[in-house]
Regions:
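Iron-sulfur-cluster electron-transfer modules
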Residues: 228-232, 419-505
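Flexible glycine/proline-rich, aromatic-decorated loop/lid segments
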Residues: 155, 159, 223-225, 275, ...
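A mid-to-C-terminal "edge-of-domain" accessory segment
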Residues: 77, 88-89, 94, 160-161, ...
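Iron-sulfur cluster-binding cysteine motifs and their immediate structural context
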Residues: 352-357, 388-412, 439-466
């Protein structure tokens, strides 16, 4: 969440895990019998983990490097912090899985500790004319009882229609406590820090639940709003970097200037400033070589800024993926990267789990194999394929999910436009009839969890309408029903009442 930082992230609260490895072996690290069985069946893995642990601990320079890198949020590459944090090989294996993105095994179950939920909290939106001063304020607040501090740059504020002022930077802060008295003391301590800064408006802390909800709705609304206003046919890319807190003012201003210099005038920067962790959003087209070059140049400069200048994290929360795979060794250095590769080979010697993710020998993999987003249907063109809709899709797991329907329809549209593979086009169109069309409930539940509020059912209705031939029997029945709704409704009611009457004893 907004306040987990590094002290309460998934690695810190993880207790045990049920893992399925590449060879099909199942290990439950929280079960003594499972651990003993794994020792007997895979002694080479246990010994390998212990050997890596001992070599890491014997290298003071590497230990220092690892601790420094994980002092801030960092998920670039594999999580090698367990080698200095834990001694038991099963604990190390458990925590190696965190952030591994399916490259080491499948986590089917896990046990985590819960955090304390404070009953009282107070929030305030702090506005600054200058981004640097906003960041300097965050640095100063770091030593106060602040729970979280979220930065929203001018584009972020504009996207959610904040009318406080023009070209402002905001910091949304929150503090929490077990008692009202402690909460008041926390607010007073934070207000004392704020006295040293030039705020655009007087800060107003509120503990009213409705007001608090409005503040945090603004923060939550940035990504879907910005993504929803991107030009059609472009991909929304949200990157995720982190700096050490003392570098925050300089690094934030450098990042903002870099995005502007590379032509990303509509980009926005927001995120967990208290942890030095920012997300920046860009709308990127990959249609031309110039588009690809623009993106390549930006990523090259980002790596120089984050790694060379500030020794930060190229990935703080979202995972390495393919986009940052070529830069893992650059960030970590050869020794740490060698440890990661050794772990990968130990747990997945045949490289069958998510190949190309985190570890990729192609230095240009981040500018290859782009997924096109052709204009397909006005109801779905804003889709960014995040998959949030799938939890409410009735056919997900049976045939296709709402996201998969959109992906397939985009591929059909692309094949129609390019004409490159007519056989594949016909196959997709034929298979979609059942998997995509007939099994779609078209009830719109998918839109309730979609950040863009996209109703894939509207797409299905369009496709079904298009499939009905004019003057066909189906078309005539549809026309008749549309022209005689009251009579049909009455007839259905009468039929239902008759059935009820017949079924009564």
């Amino acid at each position: 969440g907004m306040s987990c930082g590094t002290h309460a992230n998934s690695d810190k609260v993880l207790k045990s895990m049920r893992i399925v490895f590449a060879d099909g072996t199942v290990l439950d690290t929280g079960d003594a019998d499972s651990r003993n069985a794994f020792k007997q069946s895979h002694p080479e893995i246990i010994k390998g983990i212990e050997d890596i642990r001992d070599r890491v601990l014997a290298d003071d320079e590497l230990v220092k490097r690892i601790k420094h890198k994980y002092a801030i949020k960092n998920v670039t590459g594999l999580n090698i912090y367990p080698f200095v944090e834990h001694t038991d090989p099963f604990d190390i294996i458990t925590h190696l899985m965190v952030g591994s993105e399916g490259t080491l095994g499948f986590a089917s179950e896990f046990t985590m500790t819960t955090g304390h939920l404070y009953p009282y909290s107070s929030s305030a939106m702090l506005y600054f004319k200058d981004m640097r001063e906003a960041c300097e304020c965050v640095v100063a607040l770091k030593n106060s009882p602040v729970e979280c501090a979220e930065l929203l740059d001018k584009k972020s504020l504009a996207s959610v229609n904040d009318t406080t002022g023009d070209n402002l930077t905001a910091i949304l802060v929150r503090t929490s406590a077990d008692t009202k008295e402690q909460l008041a003391a926390n607010v007073a301590a934070m207000e004392k820090v704020l006295e040293g800064f030039n705020l655009y408006v007087q800060p107003k802390f509120t503990s009213d639940p409705e007001e608090n909800a409005k503040y945090w709705a603004i923060r939550s609304g940035v990504f879907p709003v910005v993504a929803g206003t991107r030009p059609l046919g472009t991909t929304v890319i949200i990157e995720d970097i982190a700096f050490h807190i003392e570098d925050l003012p300089d690094a934030t201003c450098d990042l903002a200037q870099m995005l502007q210099d590379h032509g990303y005038d509509d980009s926005c920067i927001y995120g967990h400033a208290l942890e030095g962790n920012y997300h920046f959003i860009i709308a990127q087209s990959f249609k031309t070589e110039a588009d690809v070059k623009q993106y390549r140049d930006l990523m090259s400069e980002i790596t120089k800024l984050v790694v060379d200048k500030y020794d930060g994290s190229l990935k703080a929360e979202h995972g390495t993926g393919r986009n940052m795979a070529p830069f893992v060794e650059k960030e970590w250095g050869p020794k740490a990267f060698a440890v990661m590769k050794e772990v990968k080979h130990l747990l997945d010697p045949q490289n069958i789990l998510n190949p190309g993710v985190i570890f990729n020998d192609d230095p240009d993999c981040f500018v290859k194999s782009f997924k096109p987003l052709p204009l397909t249907n006005e109801h779905i063109d804003k889709c960014m394929e995040c998959g949030f809709c799938e939890v409410n899709c009735l056919s997900c797991g049976f045939t296709m999910s709402s996201r998969q329907r959109i992906v397939v329809q985009r591929e059909i549209a692309r094949l129609k436009a390019t004409g490159e593979d007519d056989a594949r086009l016909k196959r997709l169109q034929k298979q979609y009839v059942y998997y995509g069309n007939m099994t779609c409930a078209a009830d719109g539940l998918c839109s309730t969890s979609c950040p863009m509020k996209i109703n894939t059912g509207d797409l299905t209705h369009d496709l079904r309408n298009a499939a009905i031939k004019p003057n066909s029997f189906t078309h005539k029945v549809g026309d008749f029903c549309a022209d005689n709704v009251p009579a049909i409704r009455s007839g259905i009611k009468l039929a239902l009442l008759s059935l009820i009457h017949i079924s009564e004893p």
